[in-house]
């Protein structure tokens, strides 16, 4: 968000992590207790950071994309390989760099997604998977049971693998991916708020 599909197409998940780490360093220097959290790709990034930073108060992950429902996402690795081959053969006209998107929140989401960006998301989640047992801080995993983008089986997998003893999995009966906005979102906000307040009181 905040740049362009073309910009996302040229980025790696390692750059996303570097940006997150810089933000965490700044906030940690200003606050005694920091709770890491994120939605969708941001949830994956938050969990990745939580596995490596043990001084955070806790982490929450909303709709983390461990498993994607979107059929187009399943073809991202093959399309990414095809695009790289076409680059080597100087056949840029044969490349398929973007797929059309019908966002739930058009005011913040792109109308086309870069194949390379989807592939980087998959690389992020692949890198996260073996790190999940290293998360030892309080963890809250939240998911919609009818998410059209993220398969709830993936969030359950995350919850089971997280190493923290203090962990909770909450499944909301909402039929969309973007559960932080719209009808029912106040229930999600309340649950996250309760989690953060509890961690703020802990010493």
Protein language model features and the residues they cover:
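Short beta-strand/loop motif that positions the catalytic acidic residue
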Residues: 135, 141-143, 147
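Active-site nucleophile loop of the alpha/beta-hydrolase fold
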Residues: 60-71
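Catalytic active-site module of serine/aspartate enzymes centered on a nucleophile-bearing elbow/loop
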Residues: 168-203
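Gly/Ala-rich beta-loop-alpha elbow adjacent to hydrolase catalytic centers
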Residues: 38-42, 46
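Catalytic nucleophile-loop/oxyanion-hole region of alpha/beta-hydrolase
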Residues: 3-30, 35
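Short alpha-helix in the alpha/beta-hydrolase fold that links the catalytic acid
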Residues: 137, 151-160, 171
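Acidic catalytic loop of the alpha/beta-hydrolase fold
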Residues: 146-150, 178
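Active-site nucleophile elbow and catalytic-triad environment of alpha/beta-hydrolase enzymes
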Residues: 114-131, 137
